[in-house]
Amino acid sequence: LYQAYHDQEWGTPQRDPALLFEMLLLEGFQAGLSWITVLRKRERYREVLHGFDPLKLSQMSDERIEALMLDAGIIRNRLKLKAARRNAQAWLAVDNPAEWLWSFVGGKPKVNHFVGRSDVPAVTDEAKAMSKALQKAGFTFVGPTICYAFMQATGMVMDHTTDCDRYAALAR
């Protein structure tokens, strides 16, 4: 599962607003946990969170959140579930959220040339700026580390290391 995600999705530039929203929420759900935990629960999240439809999520009731707290198929964290609802509301209030998010890297992927994984930073100035702007717009669970992981996952920054099979394909 993790290898497939790495080989087929991570670091590939993504401009689809629906997938960007999904990834932003998943990165928030991951806070304090391993990414593989989130990947294993991703399909269940899609089922119970209306396919990550921001309009439907923005209207999720407190009762629905409480019901989701009983679902072992997801990460049962009330704050993260409420953040998903709040982030959906904030997402809907942003004019062209995909373009806005991509603006933090100048609208095109920032290709890095890291040799080893230890060279890859956890946070960058762009991620700090994105985090600050998202928080100002009403988003939660969007600290700089989460934002940088989001930028990596969606290909806003290309952090496959130079010895990775995906590097050559994505560095073009």
Regions found by a protein language model. Give the residues of each.
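HhH-family (HhH-GPD) DNA N-glycosylase catalytic core used in base-excision repair
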Residues: 1-172
